[in-house]
Structure formats: C-alpha cells, structure tokens
C-alpha cells in the first residue's frame, strides 16, 4: 500500500481528513490533518501521532521523525471537496498557466459547478476594470490556499467591556 493511502485510510478510520503529506530531509514525515466539523486541537495531533507511529512501525515504513499538525489558518485546498467546503471564503489561487497575463488571484471562492470530473470553480475578484469572475478547473491550479482571517476580538465575551 502506498504511504499516502496507508495514512489516509488510518485517518479516515479515526474520523480525520488527510490535508497534506510531506517527506522532508533527514527522515522527517509531516502529516497535516483536519476535522471538518470541529477543527483540530493539540489533543487530536497527539492521538493521531500515537496511532500513526504504531501503523508505520507495523508497516515497516522508513522514517526518523513524525510531525502531525493542523493545516493552519492558510490551509491548502487540494481536492474538489476542499473547494466545495470553503465556497464563500477568501482564497489565494496560483494557476499553472496565466490567464490574461496573470497567474495569481485573490478573491471569494464560488462553489464548483458542472458535470462530475469536469467541474468548474469560480473566483470572484477585483480586476483592473472592476469586479470579475475567473473560472478554472482543479487541474489548472498550481496552488490554492485560504486567506487567513484573524479576529482579535473573537475571544472577548459579550458584555465584558473594558
């Protein structure tokens, strides 16, 4: 079984999603996980790390160190399900080939539409001549990430004024 398939199968069984898998120099194996309903906390990373350590040992996978992490605020979008889940969010997209001389776009993601396997994704962005819509397929994407939204007031309780 391929390493990514092995890890993804294990994570699905635990109720998590594999966002990204990275093999780095010196035997480092990085696994980025998510849980769509609740997000990720440190206890999730610990639990997954313990389970993957056992699975990788049993499967005789060669690695020196394992890191399990959340995908972060600027989470990558890779699968069609990611583009569906984050429709309405602000994203940064880099296309493989330029469209009208431009490869990098930042805008609001529209839900994918079209026939299965030929879905088109929309991105509403501010063009040179005003609001514009870019349509592209997942295969056109080099990189896509959420634009982090940081709300420093989000942790304040209502009625607790200073």
From Swiss-Prot:
Its main location: cytoplasm. The keyword Transmembrane does not apply. InterPro entries: Ribosome_maturation_RimP, RimP_C, RimP_C_sf, RimP_N, RimP_N_sf. It is found in: Cytoplasm. Disulfide bonds: none annotated. Transmembrane segments: none annotated. CDD domains: YlxS_C. GO terms for biological process: ribosomal small subunit assembly; translation. Keywords: Cytoplasm, Ribosome biogenesis. It comes from the Bacteria. Belongs to the RimP family. Required for maturation of 30S ribosomal subunits. This is Ribosome maturation factor RimP. It comes from Cupriavidus metallidurans (strain ATCC 43123 / DSM 2839 / NBRC 102507 / CH34).
